Amino acid sequence: MFKSFSMELAGRTLTVDIGRVCAQANGAALVKYGDTTVLSTVTASVKPREGIDFFPLSVEYEEKMYSVGKIPGGFNKREGKASENAILTSRVIDRPMRPLFPKDYRNDVTINNMVMAVDPECRPELVGMIGSALVTTISDIPFDGPCATTQMGMVNGELIVNPNQEQWINGDLQLTVASTRTKVIMIEAGANEVPEDKMLEAIYKCHDVNQTVIEFIDKIVAECGKEKHEYTSCAIPEEMFAAMKEIVPPEAMEEAVFTDEKQVREENIREITDKLAEAFAENEEWLAILGEAVYQYQKKTVRKMILKDHKRPDGRAINQIRPLAAEVDLIPRVHGSAMFTRGQTQICDVVTLAPLSEVQKVDGLDANVTTKRYMHHYNFPAYSVGETKVSRGPGRREIGHGALAEKALMAVLPTEEEFPYAIRAVSETFESNGSTSMASTCASCMSLMAAGVPIKAMVAGISCGLVTGDTDDEYIVLTDIQGLEDFFGDMDFKVTGTHKGITAIQMDIKIHGLTRPIVEEAIARTREARLYIMDEVMSKAIDKPRKEVSEYAPKIIQISIDPEKIGDVVGQKGKTINEIIARTGVKIDISEEGNVSVCGTDLKMMESAVDMIRTITTEFEEGQLFTGKVVSIKEFGAFVEFAPGKEGMVHISKISKERINHVEDVLTLGDTVKVICMGKDKMGRMSFSIKDVPAEA
């Protein structure tokens, strides 16, 4: 039965239609915020997937180009693979949803959000987040909802709830917070060096707004919610754990995991697994789940060590950072390079500079975002964790990590006017044992400075973890988590920033939310840690951007011309500009405002191109001298090209001080001659003279 529900949210109407579409899905709703419309659905398989030790949740966010009145580009004229924005939005939707499903649930679940119409006043990503939580809560799929999501912008220091697209892009804060009735469950932020206290204020304001959305969802569930279906639990039997402890006592497991060497720990666990497999050889059911059982045994052991004994697997104190190292100029001939090492996590970052014509083109739903000038790409090869696997290109994780490190540096990058380059940073993971995205942030910051990019401040990043007990007051926040603490802990709270404030946050958890004291402690810890990293390690390798770009990087000269003269520089069908490029070997970019960038590696050729452009666009006065080439000879005179696409005529009477009968007696096609401007002739053409050129010229 069709029902429609509405509420006012930040000055706009949020409408949810239930029972109108997609009746065969486990849960479906047509969600509208203003005119932005997203179809949200959720489906689940009838039976659990066998032979897996994880929850198979898939989240899709589909950007339909018809939603903004566009036909997709390309040959097929239909939507292709997901855009980077769609992938990142899917990840943001996934992170608050995943912890609210039962931990022992193994049925396949797919959440899909299809963007059908976009109102610039209401961001479709937010609608997808609200719709995902709503349809899963009203469905028959086991889910401990509801949760809700709010976005917060900031313009001129004022916080704006659910900002429109312009406020979101041009403001100083892009914050997304998901929460349950009592706790924060996900934080994602990009910021322009926002102070910690202001960030906390924005987070708590989002949480308060979320409560109104949760009340709205509760109302819908009361009328349209389905009874949750029963499912087959995939939990490890307690009797199996008891048998494992008889064979491998807790003290033995603790000894196996207590080492700062990842490879040693993994070898210890392999030996324990082999020992248990031998003991359970006749129990096929237990053998089938032995890997997951050993994982859970490790997890319980590590959590107890941290929570009860304040003892970390590698012996560090709770707030201690792993050994750090930083260096620049590791790779020769590239435009900039740096390596950052934290324990057994090591990132090499390489920066490449190029003219603005090399910016990444973006074909998305936002008409105001068509290019991306700064690109950060993150690679995670199998060898970084000692595995063998064929690389098949970046996956969602790699794209997400690259985007986070990219976001971390955006606030400190120079403007196009200050530094007219396209910039690409590539983070190569040499070694991984947790928090490679934060190491990528540190490495890329140093690499940018080494490349001569005049960033406004140094940026560093660090991640905090968490282990909780049975009550909200029983918890331990860990500074700089390694892989094991990430896998077995409850939180990965990544924060990047400068001395002044925060530039990015990404928080995801495995429990049902964080209390305010935990959020505050994590933000305070990350500030303390990142200041230490910048002051004691990164600044020792490089403390400020180099004044010049690398000798191997392209050089750029910028000039401004009258926008009305752009056509003269370009010429008919690009003839003039292409001739300048052919003569000098440079690249030329011209903006609609008349800003011209001349890019090349040969400074002489670049200056020659600039002179040509200035010559073409300058209004000439009588008496100016030029050097040009004879390009045409007529009975009455010769035409001299003094700049690409620019010609003036020398009348036969102005060629020589002596009388001549034929132009060819003195001039030949291709001759280089010096001429003086005599003004314009009756036809408006530049009139030149050769004979009146001063002898000293």
Report each predicted region and the residues it spans.
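Extended amphipathic alpha-helical scaffolds
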Residues: M1-S45, D53, E230-V369, P554-D568, ...
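Long, basic N-terminal domains or extensions that often function
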Residues: M1-T232
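Glycine-rich, flexible beta-strand/loop modules in the N-terminal catalytic cores of phosphate-handling
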Residues: A25-T110, V115-A117, C122, E188, ...
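Conserved phosphate/anionic-ligand binding catalytic regions in large, soluble enzymes, centered on
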Residues: G27-A29, C122-I141, V328-V351, N433-V453, ...
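Flexible, glycine/charged-enriched surface loops at secondary-structure junctions
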Residues: K103-V109, D144-P146, V213-Y231, Q263, ...
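Short, hydrophobic beta-strand segments
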Residues: N113, I185-G190, Y231-A235, E246-A256, ...
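Mobile "lid/hinge" segments at catalytic clefts and subdomain interfaces of large enzymes
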Residues: D140-D260, L448-K547
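Single-stranded RNA-binding regions, centering on S1/OB-family and related RNA-binding modules
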Residues: L290, Y552-I556, P563-A697
